[in-house]
A protein has these predicted regions:
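Short internal beta-strands
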Residues: 57-63, 123-126, 294-299
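Glycine-rich phosphate/diphosphate-binding loops that line cofactor/substrate pockets in enzymes
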Residues: 17-31, 51, 92-94, 205-215, ...
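Gly-rich Lys/Arg/Thr-decorated short loops/hinges at beta-loop-alpha junctions or inter-strand turns
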Residues: 1-6, 70-71, 178-190, 236-239, ...
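Glycine-rich, acidic loop regions that bind phosphate or pyrophosphate groups
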Residues: 9, 65-174, 369-373
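Active-site diphosphate/adenylate-binding microenvironment
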Residues: 176-254, 259
């Protein structure tokens, strides 16, 4: 057993301040909970679920808070932010009461801070006093361990007779109606192009085959990271290991190794991009030597996909060192000319003693994923996907939720934005 020195702040829970929030909750007509990674750090997922079910308030998490609230729960808004759900961003920004729990109002969530939650009364509960009022001024700043704070709030609601409900919500029915409309009109979606493997379809198929296995999903950083967060639903905390704060490419492979060591009987899948995978590909040697049964899916578009997306958005699709294929070969974006695919991941993996299978066609995908899952050893799938797919929706830095991009930028700067759709998007305000 290890005894590692660390910082363990202990201070009394301000129960009086927390109980002042109960009338706010009672009076709110458009309430939303905005939950961050602090919920997971505090091991407060159970308390968050109870609070949401007692108060009947929908919950949007941050990327680092994914899994804090079961994403298949009726009260879940999935996650908000630059590439988050339209319905999550709309709900948080149009709420009259926002209860922020263990979140930091970072720019990937807020966009233009002055346009974030313009009409909302904001409560911010966080253990770190330096995070409160740092980016966004709030009406009710409360320094507390979020787990302790939620326990106080749950006890106060229980004392008032507010029972837990996992369905059949009776409070704020008009608000739930608006949110349901957003969910139906703007789900996470993608274009299914004939002859190509959509990267989102890969995540959906992985989810279909593994949802009942309670897997641990790790990612690198890039488009694949966002696709994993959008199209894999996480119902428990610490099931998604991703670098969402620093955004460190190459994180996925070593993270999956650590997960395998910590949970040797669990299915661990690293979802990676070809660029991110190359950052730490040497760890395949450790995986082989230590016999770690890491599964890895490379969404291989032979480009730095997220940077390509920004090149499309801002630089008229001019490429600057984002092309990762062999410049001496005739690049085939359909990936039908298999002998020009570079680098050769099956050959590289073979050199490390790790099984690798390349997937070129969508009809090959389900069986390939099944073989990967059922393998008792490390297994890599090199799945060829198109390089011109964008992660959508998208809110550019410094913009508001009303400026969300819903369609792919074609390179000429044209795209349909929410602000251009007018009455097509219902609003609560």
């Amino acid at each position: 057993e290890m005894d590692i020195p660390g910082y363990n702040p202990v201070f009394p829970v301000p129960a009086d301040k927390l109980e002042e929030l109960i009338p706010l909750i009672e009076d709110a007509r458009r309430p939303v909970i905005y939950a961050g990674g602090g919920i997971i750090s505090a091991e407060a997922s159970g308390e968050l679920l109870e609070f949401a079910e007692r108060s009947q308030i929908p919950v949007a998490t941050t990327l680092m808070g994914i899994g804090a609230m079961p994403e298949t729960h009726p009260l879940s808004l999935r996650w908000l932010g630059m590439h988050g759900a339209v319905f999550a961003n709309n709900a948080v920004n149009e709420a009259d009461l926002v209860i922020a729990l263990g979140a930091r109002f970072d720019d990937r969530v807020t966009g233009a801070v002055n346009m974030f939650c313009p009409e909302s009364t904001i409560v911010h509960i966080d253990i770190d006093a330096s995070e409160i009022n740092k980016n966004k001024k709030v009406a009710y700043p409360i320094r507390a361990n979020v787990k302790d704070a939620l326990q106080v709030l749950n006890s106060a609601l229980a004392a008032k007779g507010w029972e837990r409900r996992s369905s059949g919500f009776t409070r704020t029915p008009e608000w739930f109606g608006v949110i349901d409309g957003w969910k139906k009109q703007y789900p996470f979606s993608y274009e299914d192009r004939k002859g190509y493997i959509a990267p989102q379809a890969v995540i959906e198929e992985l989810y279909r085959q593994t949802a009942d296995k309670d897997p641990i999903i790790c990612t690198g950083v890039g488009q694949h990271q966002m696709f994993a967060a959008q199209f894999f639903k996480f119902d428990k905390p610490r099931r998604l290991a991703t670098s969402g704060g620093l955004g460190t490419m190459g994180y996925g492979l070593p993270a999956s190794m650590g997960a395998c060591l910590a949970y040797p009987d669990r299915l661990v899948v690293n979802i990676d991009g070809d660029g991110s995978m190359l950052m730490n590909i040497q760890e395949l040697a450790t995986i082989h030597v230590e016999r770690l049964p890491v599964k890895c899916i490379i969404l291989n578009n032979q480009h730095l996909g997220m940077v390509v997306q920004w090149e499309d958005l801002k630089y008229d699709s001019n490429r600057a060192q984002t092309f990762l294929a062999d410049p001496h070969d005739n690049y085939d974006p359909t990936h039908k000319t298999e002998d020009v695919i570079y680098p050769n991941y099956p050959l590289i993996c073979a050199g490390f003693g790790v099984k690798c299978e390349r997937v070129l066609r969508i009809e090959e995908l389900p069986a390939a994923i099944t073989r990967m899952i059922e393998s008792p050893e490390a297994y890599v799938l090199d799945v060829m996907v198109p390089h011109d797919v964008h992660v959508l929706p998208m809110i550019l830095g410094g913009m508001s939720y009303k400026d969300v991009i819903l369609e792919r930028i074609a390179g000429d700067g044209s795209a349909k934005k929410a602000s251009e759709l007018g009455k097509e998007i219902p609003t609560a305000l």
